[in-house]
Amino acid sequence: MEIVILLVGFSIGLVLLVKGADEMVSSAVQIALKFKLPSSIIGATFIGFGTSAPELFASTGAALKGDLDLGIGNIVGSNIANSLLVVAVLYLALPKDFSQKIKLNQISPVWMAILTTVFVSTYVLTNEFPFLLGAVLLILVIYVIYKMISTESVDEGELLGEEKNYIWLRGGLSLLATLYGSQLVVDNAVAIAELFGVSSLIIGSTIIAIGTSLPEVAGTISAAKMRKPDIVFGNIFGSNLFNIGLVGATAIMISPGEISSVIDYQLFIMYFVSFIAIFLSRNVIKRNSLLGYLFIVAYILFLFSLF
């Protein structure tokens, strides 16, 4: 009977995740049209911030308990998943006939690169995460949000839809459905795995690691179906930006100092794959199964390297 309840919970979570992601992307497009902003800006702000909420809660909670290791590990792991797993899903989910160079605002990728560089280089030089770093990152991310919203505008040719009523309400509710659905999927998947005797180490490095990226993955599939890869890359850059500039800053300011784990390798991987995502966003975007599967294999190899 217990397995039936868990499977029902898993199924409900999956439905909420998929339907919520569809509506979230649709609402993001409508919000972009209403405020005459490129879709990539909404992807970087509204969706990027929303899908970083789980990391914010988890890392802040860990920092409040004095566990900066867990908070930083969560951020680094999430950014690697965004730059490998989410990009892989995009290249696999795009329609076969889609091929175009996307119009992407340059603020979010440039500042993601800057904040990532500051974050990584500070640790490499000082071997710690000082309070000042957290304060600087927080100030920078606030400035970036202001720049993105105040300086970008959309061309008339991009105004393809009509404004719909209650788009903010729809967007907010769909985001909540996506986040709650992903949590239901992860919680029930973990419970099912434990029921069958799967170790906590395997569960943590697979189900939970991938589960934290489910909102981004679901949103990517929806955006790909709508032929909106600009939203996907906007979400990747925005999510990575918020993970470091907001989530990381908050965790560091709450619990600054050294961490006991050695994360130089993970930081290098995060830095490297973040710039790969920027490079790919500047080229013609089309369905590429080879690249998609290559990125998935790379992500799996990264997970195995953590053992």
Locate each region found by the language model.
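Hydrophobic alpha-helical segments, chiefly the membrane-spanning helices
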Residues: 1-307
